């Protein structure tokens, strides 16, 4: 009996070592590239011992999931109870869990700590939980990653395990299919393949836009400027570095300093702007304002810098430097609803252009905020009233507003069903007060304006990342960095190919020519891999009759067309910013 127990302990220890080895390896590289040799070397266990318990690395991961599923089937009740702060600290010290002790020690002395028990497993958790494990029908461990304790690079790196569960297996399968599609669309992978941007270790979190990426970015900015000019906005540009005094006035120094980059100039404290708003206040104050000047809609494509922890950086989605498409609208109280409606209409135009559906959320006052209860109530009801007047469905997020005012957030749904928060409308009565903004009313008296902060794209860089994944790199023609690729069949047709290229460029179409001495099939495939909307094959027949053979990303072989006909068709597609639907997939 004693020998059997001892053997069981050894087996448990061996399996634990193998699981820990797999966990460490999954932090370092993709799961698919991990071999049994990697695992046994990491665990310092021989191969024979590994195979005594598992067929391969996949079997090891599946056994971990199987153990989880076994717990689910046991239909274990999940019970909640509380301990005093002192008892909770003593409990976890006995269990040798210093991280949980540290969390509890940060809580007030009179705090009651909630615990949850599931079978023999007990843990600290705020909850709430299910009543039992039974409703969890489908489980999948998706990945593991390293994470510094409390997000601080100076602390020990721990293992973060990612998993997902659904009440039905079909829902899990649908989610896993979406994950696979997301991997194919990863903007970091496509950004490199399509030559759009790069990231360097010399500037972590600071993206480098390459020539094609700059074409894409500038095309978006041109659209932004055109749209805002039509909507009655003026554009300004404010400095990147501004004095500490400004940030103290705005409240950022007290509420946001940990995310700001600071420096000294001539012995004075300065900060690189994390937001465009305070500079916009100075623009408003630069001259006297009258009620006749309001609403004043001021837009800025401002470069901002925010310190993000290295573990939170992610391609273009989470960076330390980005262009914010801010606008500040200064208005009278009577103009609030109409201006909010105008902003909603503008944001709807932007998202509709790219085929995004969206839902709306209203976020209210957070714990760390400034301003009176009366101001917050008035601002919140202003946003709520506008949404109600527009007949928009919305969800209320209590306590999730900005520190200076409530906000409306727009959450986009992309082509594979993921949601992204982009557009924001924030009603602010605090900054106009802190900066002592005024206008002369119809009564000749001085009044304080109300202000809206709003963004449509949000971060331009992040929006580009979203677009790359939404379109899988296959951008609409108007947005594509290269819209047409001219493909001469052989060197004999280079001269005609150049003539076609010159005609396209003269019409304002972004075009390139492939002059390499490669087979035409290879050239076509290369252009397809670069997601180029149109390929024009030119040979002897095309040259003789001033034609082009058109292949498109949307319909495959579209046959021969006159060059003038093709140019007219594509310039119309670009001018109207049309999105052609794919009717035939290219092989």
Per-segment meaning from a language model:
Residues 13-35:
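Short, amphipathic alpha-helix enriched in basic
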Residues 62-587:
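NTP/phosphate- and nucleic-acid-binding module
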Residues 14, 46-47:
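Short coil turns linking two alpha-helices in DNA-binding domains
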Residues 2-6, 27-31, 44-45, 51-61:
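HTH DNA-binding helix-turn interface
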Residues 18, 37-42, 50:
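Append "Primarily bacterial transcriptional regulators
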């Amino acid at each position: 009996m004693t020998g059997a127990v001892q053997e069981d302990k050894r087996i448990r220890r061996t399996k634990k070592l193998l699981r820990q080895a797999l966990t460490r390896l999954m932090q370092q590289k993709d799961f698919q590239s991990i071999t049994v040799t990697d695992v046994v070397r990491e665990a310092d266990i021989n191969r024979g011992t590994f195979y005594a318990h598992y067929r391969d690395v996949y079997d090891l991961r599946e056994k971990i999931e199987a153990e989880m599923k076994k717990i689910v089937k046991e239909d274990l009740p999940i019970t909640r109870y509380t301990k005093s702060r002192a008892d909770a600290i003593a409990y976890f010290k006995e269990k040798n869990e210093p991280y949980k002790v540290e969390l509890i020690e940060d809580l007030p002395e009179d705090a009651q700590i909630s615990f949850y028990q599931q079978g023999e497993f007990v843990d600290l958790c705020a909850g709430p939980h299910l009543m039992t494990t039974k409703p969890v029908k489908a489980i999948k461990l998706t990945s593991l990653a390293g994470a510094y304790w409390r997000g601080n690079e100076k602390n020990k790196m721990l293992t973060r395990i990612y998993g997902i569960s659904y009440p039905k297996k079909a829902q899990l399968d649908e989610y896993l299919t979406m994950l696979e599609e997301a991997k194919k669309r990863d903007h970091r992978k496509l950004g490199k393949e399509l030559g759009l941007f790069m990231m360097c270790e010399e500037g972590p979190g600071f993206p480098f836009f390459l020539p094609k990426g700059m074409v894409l970015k500038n095309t978006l900015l041109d659209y932004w400027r055109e749209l805002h000019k039509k909507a009655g906005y003026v554009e300004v540009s404010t400095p990147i570095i501004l004095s500490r005094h400004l940030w103290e006035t705005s409240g950022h120094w007290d509420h946001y300093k940990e995310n700001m980059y600071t420096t000294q100039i001539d012995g004075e404290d300065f900060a690189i702007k994390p937001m465009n708003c305070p500079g916009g206040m100075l623009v408003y104050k630069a001259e006297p304002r009258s009620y006749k000047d309001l609403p004043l809609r001021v837009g800025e494509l401002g470069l901002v810098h925010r310190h993000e922890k290295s573990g939170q950086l992610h391609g273009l989605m989470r960076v330390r430097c980005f262009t914010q498409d801010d606008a500040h609208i200064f208005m009278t109280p009577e103009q609030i609803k109409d201006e909010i409606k105008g902003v909603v209409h503008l944001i709807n135009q932007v998202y509709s252009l790219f085929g995004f559906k969206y839902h709306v959320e209203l976020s209210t006052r957070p714990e760390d905020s400034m301003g009176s209860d009366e101001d917050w109530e008035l601002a919140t009801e202003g946003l709520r009233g506008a949404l109600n007047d527009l007949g928009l469905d919305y969800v209320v997020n209590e306590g999730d507003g900005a520190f200076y005012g409530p906000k409306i957030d727009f959450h986009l749904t992309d082509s594979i069903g993921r949601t992204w928060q982009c557009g924001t409308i924030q009603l602010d009565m605090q900054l106009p007060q802190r900066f002592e903004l005024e206008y002369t009313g119809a009564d000749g008296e001085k009044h304080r304006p109300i202000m809206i902060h709003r963004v449509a794209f949000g971060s331009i860089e992040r929006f580009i990342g979203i677009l790359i994944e939404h379109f899988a790199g296959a951008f609409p023609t108007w947005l594509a960095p290269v819209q047409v690729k001219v493909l001469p069949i052989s060197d004999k047709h280079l001269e005609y190919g150049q003539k076609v290229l010159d005609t396209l460029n003269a019409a304002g179409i972004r075009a390139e020519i492939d002059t390499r001495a490669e087979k035409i099939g290879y050239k076509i495939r290369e252009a397809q891999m670069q997601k180029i909307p149109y390929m024009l094959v030119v040979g002897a027949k095309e040259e003789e009759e001033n034609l082009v053979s058109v292949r498109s990303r949307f319909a495959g072989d579209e046959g021969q067309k006159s060059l003038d006909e093709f140019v007219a068709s594509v310039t119309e597609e670009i001018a109207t910013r049309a999105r052609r639907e794919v009717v035939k997939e290219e092989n």
